[in-house]
UniProtKB/Swiss-Prot annotation:
GO terms for molecular function: metal ion binding; oxidoreductase activity, acting on NAD(P)H, heme protein as acceptor. It comes from Bacillus cytotoxicus (strain DSM 22905 / CIP 110041 / 391-98 / NVH 391-98). It holds the Pfam family COX15-CtaA. It is found in: Cell membrane. This is Heme A synthase. The chain crosses the membrane at residues 7-27, 63-83, 92-112, 122-142, 160-180, 212-232, 243-263, 272-292.
Amino acid sequence: MQRFIKWLAVITSLDLLGVLLGGALVTKTDSGQGCGKSWPLCNGELVPSNLSMETIIELSHRLTSGSAGILVTLLCILSWKYYKHVRETKPLAILSFVFLVAQALMGAAAVVWGQVPAVLAIHFGISLISFASVILLACLIFEIDKKFDARSLIMDKKMKFHIYGVTIYSYLVVYTGALVRHERASLACPEFPLCSKNRPWPTQLHEWVQMGHRVAAILLFAWIVYAMILAIRHYKQERVVYLGWITSFILVTLQAIVGILVVYTNASLTMALLHSLFISCLFAVLCYLVMLGTRSKVNAKQTTSTENKRFFS
C-alpha cells in the first residue's frame, strides 16, 4: 500500500502542476471563455460539438482540474490513514483538499460571472497553496526528513524570520505577477529594468502594474540571496536548510531570467509557462522550509524539556 501511495503522491503532484500550467495557458491563449459561460458543461453540452482551439484548451484545463480533485481526495484519505503518526500530515491533507475545492469554485465563478483580473489572480494563488501542500505531503510520504536528518533540526529566530518572511512575501509577489498576466500588462513596459528608453517611469495603469511587479520581484531576489548567504555561513552542517536556500536561489534566478525574456520575446508562450513553473517550484521549496521552521520550534521545546529533566533528576 505504501508503494501505491508514493506513486499516487507523484502523479497527484504532477497533475496539480498541470493544473497550474494549464491555467497559465488558458490565460495566455485567452481561452477563458472557450466553453462560454456554462459550467460544469461546455457551451451547454457535455461533449461540445464545435471544438475550437480555445474550447479544447479550456476543456482540457477543466478535465485536469477534475482529475486533480479525485487524486487529491484519494491522497488525503490514504495519507490520513497510513501517515497520521507524522505531525504535519493531517493539516497538510486538509489544506490540500480545502484549497483545491476553493480554486475550483473560483474558476467556476470566473467562467460564470466574468473574467475579473483580481479574481483570476486569487484563483492562481489558491491553486499554488494546494500544489505546495500536496508537494509537502509527498515529501512526508517519501520520508525526505530521514534522508536529510531533518527531524531533530533546530533553527535560530533569525533564520526562521527569513523563512517565514520570504515565503509570505513571495506569495504577495505571485499575486502581483498574476495581476500582470490577467491585466494584460506583460508587454506594458518594453524595456528592462526601466519601463522604456523614452519613458523610464510608468505613466498609466498597465505600466504601474508591470513596474510594481518588477520592483517586488527584485526585492524578493535580494532577500533570497541574503538568506542564502546566512545559510551558507551558519547552516552548512544542516544540509536541508543549506540546500533549501541554494535551491531557492537557483529557482528565483531562473524565474528572474525568464521574466526578463518574457519582455524581450514578446511574451512567448514558452516563457510564460516557464515563468509559472519556476515560481510554483520556488514556493513549494519555501513552504518546505516553513514546515521545517515550525518543526524546529517543537524540537527546541523538547530539547529544553529533556535538559530540565536531566538537571532535576
